[in-house]
Curated annotation (Swiss-Prot):
This is ATP-dependent Clp protease adapter protein ClpS. Binds to the N-terminal domain of the chaperone ClpA. NCBIfam families: PRK00033.1-5. SUPFAM superfamilies: ClpS-like (SSF54736). InterPro entries: ClpS, ClpS_core, Ribosomal_bL12_C/ClpS-like. It holds the Pfam family ClpS. It comes from the Bacteria. GO terms for biological process: protein catabolic process; proteolysis. Belongs to the ClpS family. Involved in the modulation of the specificity of the ClpAP-mediated ATP-dependent protein degradation.
Amino acid sequence: MATQKQDEFLLETEQTRTKPPPLYKVLLLNDDFTPMDFVIVVLQKFFGMDRERATRVMLQVHREGMGVCGVFPKDVAATKVEQVVAFARQHQHPLACVMEEN
């Protein structure tokens, strides 16, 4: 009798566990107008990258058309996209930043 209650408790515990929220990649997209140095500043300011890593990501964006800035929960990713786009517009650059499910 005790094992049946333990089994029911374990079953309930397993059913109530939630899976972690999906993560989203934040991507920068290449354009022909935004200066490379500005992209490096964005990567350092909003994604906490050191200059070397920011330069590598910037070159990936330049050569491959896009680069991953980081992977975050949905709300954090959306905030970062908004911040980057607003900062770029404030400095009159057309830099595009998007997010996609990881």
